Amino acid sequence: MRVTDFSFELPESLIAHYPMPERSSCRLLSLDGPTGALTHGTFTDLLDKLNPGDLLVFNNTRVIPARLFGRKASGGKIEVLVERMLDDKRILAHIRASKAPKPGAELLLGDDESINATMTARHGALFEVEFNDDRSVLDILNSIGHMPLPPYIDRPDEDADRELYQTVYSEKPGAVAAPTAGLHFDEPLLEKLRAKGVEMAFVTLHVGAGTFQPVRVDTIEDHIMHSEYAEVPQDVVDAVLAAKARGNRVIAVGTTSVRSLESAAQAAKNDLIEPFFDDTQIFIYPGFQYKVVDALVTNFHLPESTLIMLVSAFAGYQHTMNAYKAAVEEKYRFFSYGDAMFITYNPQAINERVGE
């Protein structure tokens, strides 16, 4: 399969730079996986698409202010993007500089350069940085960090993004990108879903900056997926197995929830799914056998991205590309602050040939 098979033309005017005034007021394109039928509506229509007893699985990661600006003590400007927090004093990060710092280099971070840190080691493209400060990494980031808006939202971060670029149920700090399908859920909608009898469970996957890295190979099978930490606790496993047993659907909110659930299913030894607390490099593309997820809430993804490949594996390649073509024609808003899709699983997708 070629990466270019997942390309599509997207006018720049359709990239959303700000969210809708109300979280749940965005548009919703529904794709029936088995038939490819499309329905246009608004996000609150989700209430009518879910049945009592269906299980919504959310990702409760919280975005940290992961972008830091400063300079090397030797003079050159740097930009630091946290990939993950290693402990209370150390981070693993991407560093942009005219010349990469060497181990032992002193870094002065923050708008006033008041935070002192040391680059202690290099791991491939990533740098290990230790803060020389009494405060925890999280306290330092909250004090001097900027929200790491995706590169296609071409504007500086604003104070409002600290709230807008978080889900209302975010709980566990550690992500450098929001699980954006969840941004559309507000408390009134969540209350209505609960009142209808829709069940809810929460996994944690700390989205890394690697999620924005382009696929740099021509053939999909040659791509090496970035690693992210995921948690699927026992209560989620119990909720999934109970939903399946009573004939209800498991609906993943976002591709990160999909990757968490399917990672736990892949690693399971004795059951459909078992608790999972580990790094995952799961790469889902056409031909992948889904085991857990029956329906998916997701945003519109970048051309040639691993995420549009994941959706194609779920709904079928042709159905997915047709849906994206319709979304462009109907002027849906794309990417992190854009509109959403509701997709049901296409069991025939695994047999579809792509690019032939």
Curated annotation (Swiss-Prot):
**What does the record give as the reaction this protein catalyses?**
7-aminomethyl-7-carbaguanosine(34) in tRNA + S-adenosyl-L-methionine = epoxyqueuosine(34) in tRNA + adenine + L-methionine + 2 H(+)
- Is the keyword Protein transport in the record? no
What EC numbers are recorded for this enzyme? 2.4.99.17
Q: In which pathway does it act?
A: tRNA modification; tRNA-queuosine biosynthesis
Task: Supply one GO molecular-function term.
Answer: S-adenosylmethionine:tRNA ribosyltransferase-isomerase activity
Under the cellular component aspect of Gene Ontology, which terms does the record hold?
cytoplasm
Keywords from UniProt, A to Z, are: Cytoplasm, Queuosine biosynthesis, S-adenosyl-L-methionine, Transferase
Which GO annotations describe the biological process of this protein?
queuosine biosynthetic process; tRNA wobble guanine modification
Signal peptide annotation: none
* Transmembrane regions: none
Task: Quote the subcellular location field of this record.
Answer: Cytoplasm
Q: What class of enzyme is it?
A: transferase
Function (record text):
Transfers and isomerizes the ribose moiety from AdoMet to the 7-aminomethyl group of 7-deazaguanine (preQ1-tRNA) to give epoxyqueuosine (oQ-tRNA).
Family per similarity comment: Belongs to the QueA family.
Subunit comment? Monomer.
- This protein is called S-adenosylmethionine:tRNA ribosyltransferase-isomerase
Q: Which organism is it from?
A: Escherichia coli (strain 55989 / EAEC)
